[in-house]
């Protein structure tokens, strides 16, 4: 049986998500799609939290990191989280075609 993790969101993740939501809703004029993306993101994070988040493949980075970054892919976006003791800390929400090495 795996340990239970608490969930924590960094302000940077919340900022990333808000910027994407605003872009889809206001620039692309598709608030329904923006809301669906938020819902899909919430569901994917909660699902990962309940399915032993350490059991998934980490993101391979050239940088030395104190904590491994794990990706969750949601449509054209990727959520990155780390595990710190009993906390799943959600750190970034980025467009999947961006250069992750410059963002995390």
Which positions does each model-derived feature cover?
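Enriched for short, Lys/Arg-rich terminal
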Residues: 70-104
């Amino acid at each position: 049986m795996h340990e239970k993790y608490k969930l924590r969101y960094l302000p940077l993740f919340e900022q990333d998500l808000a910027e994407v939501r605003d872009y889809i809703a206001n620039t692309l004029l598709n608030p329904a799609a923006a809301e669906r993306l938020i819902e899909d993101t919430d569901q994917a994070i909660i699902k990962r939290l309940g399915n032993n988040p350490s059991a998934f493949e980490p993101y391979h980075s050239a940088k030395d990191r104190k904590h491994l970054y794990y990706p969750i892919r949601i449509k054209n976006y990727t959520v990155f989280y780390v595990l710190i003791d009993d906390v799943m800390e959600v750190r970034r929400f980025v467009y999947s075609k961006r250069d992750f090495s410059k963002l995390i």
